[in-house]
Regions:
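Structural motif corresponding to the intra-repeat A-B loop/turn of tetratricopeptide repeats
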Residues: 77, 114, 148, 157, ...
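Short solvent-exposed coil/turn linkers within tandem alpha-helical repeat scaffolds
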Residues: 93-100, 130-135, 175-194, 226-231, ...
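Terminal, low-structured helical/coil segments at or just beyond the last alpha-helical repeat
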Residues: 32-34, 180-182, 193-205, 209, ...
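TPR repeat positional signature
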Residues: 68-71, 104, 138, 145, ...
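N-terminal leader/linker segments that initiate helical-solenoid repeat arrays
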Residues: 22-102, 286
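Residue-level recognition of tetratricopeptide repeat
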Residues: 109, 143, 147-150, 205, ...
Length: 286
């Protein structure tokens, strides 16, 4: 899952900052978007000019803040290891900055890519507190929380409900996003679909493992693998499990085959594929 994110993080983080840093800001990988149309790209003040619409005097620029944000903005397509200290340092030095929502969004994605999941949840929660319509973070948390939370945890019910709320809200917001001028149509659609895929992935896992609704899980997980520009093998694994539980054994064989091609679950997928093949010949399937 993390490797998949790393392959696409450059485009997604660039997209996240483009639609997220402003009056209504967002980053979830894979924040962007708001209840209203998301703000246009927020670049360092030295690049965009900080003049008011009424011709008033420009707001006083904190040169240290602008320099720090410029370095962070430039690093948005780099490795998570290069972004994390810049984001953390910015937050510590400028806790009241108007750039803060975008910084927390970028930090959430960077923590996820670096597999620092607990820190990712903390940063993501802060990003959503600052902007409840942060599409990037909503989608990322919906997917990551559903995989991280275990039914045995004391607060599992509340965490699953929160993940579902994040997923549904992201799915509600994404179709109404406005394309930033800095991004072409194809890149914009790809980014939107990748976010939708993450939200549907989270819902599918919860339908399967929490609500015991394999048919609903199949619907959500099918959307996840169809929408994703680079489908997550974990989603194919979960889809195969949902297929088996709903007695779609031949579909399960196909899902496990795709899961077994790459990723962290190759051995498990191959084993389950063989089991599904036997079920297809010995059990009443659909």
């Amino acid at each position: 899952m993390t490797a998949k994110f790393l392959r696409s993080s450059a485009v997604l983080i660039a997209f996240a900052l483009a639609v997220s840093v402003g009056a209504k800001v967002s980053t979830a990988q894979y924040g962007g978007g708001g209840r209203d149309i998301p703000a246009q790209p927020s670049q360092p003040a030295a690049e965009k000019g900080d003049k008011s619409e009424k011709g008033e005097k420009p707001a006083k620029v904190n040169k240290a803040e602008e320099a720090a944000y410029k370095a962070l903005y430039t690093a948005r397509t780099g490795t998570p290891e290069s972004q994390i200290p810049l984001c953390e340092d910015f937050i510590a030095k400028f806790p009241q900055s108007h750039y803060l929502v975008g910084v927390y969004s970028q930090l959430t994605s960077a923590y996820f890519a670096a597999d620092q999941i607990d820190k990712m949840f903390a940063a993501g929660t802060k990003a959503v507190e600052l902007n409840p319509d942060n599409i990037d973070v909503l989608a990322l948390l919906a997917m990551a929380m559903s995989r991280r939370v275990k039914p045995s945890m004391p607060d599992a019910k509340q965490q699953y409900e929160k993940a579902e709320t994040y997923a549904h809200h992201a799915i509600e917001l994404i179709p109404n996003m406005a394309k930033p001028d800095t991004i072409d149509d194809a890149t914009f659609e790809k980014a939107k679909n990748d976010k939708l895929a993450m939200a549907h992935s989270g819902l599918g896992l919860i339908d399967l493992q929490v609500h015991d609704k394999p048919e609903d899980a199949r619907t959500e997980l099918t959307q996840a693998v169809q929408l994703a520009s680079n489908p997550d093998p974990v989603d194919y694994y979960l889809l195969g499990n949902a297929d088996v539980k709903a007695s779609y054994f031949n579909d399960a064989v196909a899902a496990y085959e795709k899961c077994a091609a790459t990723g962290p679950l190759v051995a498990a997928c191959k084993s389950r594929q063989e089991s599904a093949k036997k079920d297809a010949t010995t059990k009443m399937g659909r």
